[in-house]
Amino acid sequence: MTAGRIIKNFNGYYYVETPDKEIVTCKIKGKMKQVRFSAVTGDMVEFEKNPDGESMIKTILSRRNFMERPTMANLDCIVIAFACADPDFSCLLADKMLAFAERAGIEAVLCLNKTDLVSEAQLEEIAGVYRKAGYTVFTVSTFNGTGLEALKEYLNGKISAFAGPSGVGKSSMLNALQPGIALQTGKVSEKIGRGRHTTRYAQLLPFNGGYLADTPGFGNLLAENIDARELYKYFREFKNFEHGCKFVPCTHTHEPVCGVKNAVEEGKIAASRYESYLAILDEIKLLKEKSGKR
């Protein structure tokens, strides 16, 4: 048996990199195929090498972490990538992605691209919200190169993935960090205000002692498989004010004495973050109702 890491999976084939950097194309057995997310990019596996036929993955080793969207495992970091403009920044989408990362137990940072399209005040209006919430925020421009060195230094030696909506410049950022690492880039559609998908699957690419992954973009993101009762845990700044809640647990919605709601009123928690929290709660409720009707 040989050990390795899945660096790409596409059309039922799994490309496994061994410790000596050999890439072996593998399949998985039928029983594994029946389990959703049984093997994903980033998984450490053991496989039976067959030089005369298909090599077969036999075992998926224990995961450090797993994220469903993008579908990857064993990440050190996820870079939540958004544009400041073209397409416009979406607080709700950013907050969903950060909540998903918190749920998965993966370190997340926010990377704001296209800073050359906005003023300093506009940039700080976005970045300040997330720095206040306790996140590291990188501000970059692939047009003029601003901020790329700081991001590159942070990513050195890590297994990281870039995730975000279509058209925000994920592939362009990767190409700026290491020329040629991600070749396809696309423009934002003027009609729909979103990017055209150019990355079709997640692939780990060697980068400065670690790996970087570009991942497929998206136009929308559903809050599936999140328990409404657990959502507050995924807004990291809430915990700093929960001591002011009269009821435990507190949903931070209708309760008369709530430290989180007070913090929002006092400007200690950004109103946009709290609005995203309420919107995601409503979405979870709606998804649950629709599921119950099936």
Regions found by a protein language model. Name each.
Residues 1-10:
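Structural detector for short beta-strands of small beta-barrel domains
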Residues 52-60, 88-90:
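Short, Lys/Arg- and Gly-enriched loop/turn segments at beta-strand edges
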